[in-house]
């Protein structure tokens, strides 16, 4: 979502609360729970899941491996649910031409650096840069080159923008900030 006026441009960034992350976390949770139940039922010798009899799965080695995969999947699933609940990666980009300041804010993982806040002057921005990597997994990322601080990515690497969309976004931002565009 973007909000613009004559002097201020605010772009809200969605973090890890995306539909795909919810789906993957849910599928991974159910799958790993199934693996753990199968491993546990082979250990107990009782049928906890009615899809197939427990006599078909011997605890050593199949039951142990299934239990291990189930536990590992539950850990990964809990990691995904935590990143979703903390909304890691969300935030905003605020470009204020009137005050001459750019503010970039992102939420991180809990701890000392939970709030990531970058603030610098518009006059320190050298250019808006588009980095394009073509191939099987094409990637187009929009960067802002800052004098003395390097490049700051403005779009996520998993955000699959078409060439037209990334060019339009870069052109609008470069026009708003009155800086040149570079393409690599």
Swiss-Prot record:
It is a multi-pass membrane protein. It comes from the Eukaryota. Keywords: Chloroplast, Membrane, Photosynthesis, Plastid, Thylakoid, Transmembrane, Transmembrane helix. It holds the Pfam family Ycf4. GO terms for biological process: photosynthesis. It is found in: Plastid, Chloroplast thylakoid membrane. One of its GO terms (cellular component) is chloroplast thylakoid membrane. InterPro entries: PSI_Ycf4_assembly (IPR003359). The chain crosses the membrane at residues 19-39, 57-77. Seems to be required for the assembly of the photosystem I complex. Belongs to the Ycf4 family. HAMAP family: Ycf4 (MF_00437). This is Photosystem I assembly protein Ycf4. It comes from Atropa belladonna. The gene is ycf4.
């Amino acid at each position: 979502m973007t909000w613009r006026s004559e002097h201020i441009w605010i772009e809200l960034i969605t973090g890890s609360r995306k539909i795909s992350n919810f789906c993957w976390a849910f599928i991974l949770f159910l799958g790993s729970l199934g693996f753990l139940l199968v491993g546990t039922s082979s250990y107990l010798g009782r049928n906890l899941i009615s899809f197939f009899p427990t006599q078909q799965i011997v605890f050593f080695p199949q039951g142990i491996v299934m239990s291990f995969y189930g536990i590992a999947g539950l850990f990964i699933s809990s990691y995904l649910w935590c990143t979703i609940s903390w909304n890691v990666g969300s935030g905003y980009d605020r470009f204020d031409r009137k005050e001459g300041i750019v503010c970039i804010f992102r939420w991180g993982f809990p701890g000392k650096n939970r709030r990531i806040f970058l603030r610098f002057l518009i006059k320190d921005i050298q250019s808006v840069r588009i980095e394009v990597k073509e191939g099987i997994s094409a990637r187009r990322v929009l960067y802002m080159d800052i004098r003395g601080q390097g490049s700051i990515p403005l779009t996520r690497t998993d955000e699959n923008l078409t060439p037209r969309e990334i060019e339009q976004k870069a052109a609008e931002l470069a026009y708003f900030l009155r800086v040149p565009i570079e393409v690599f």
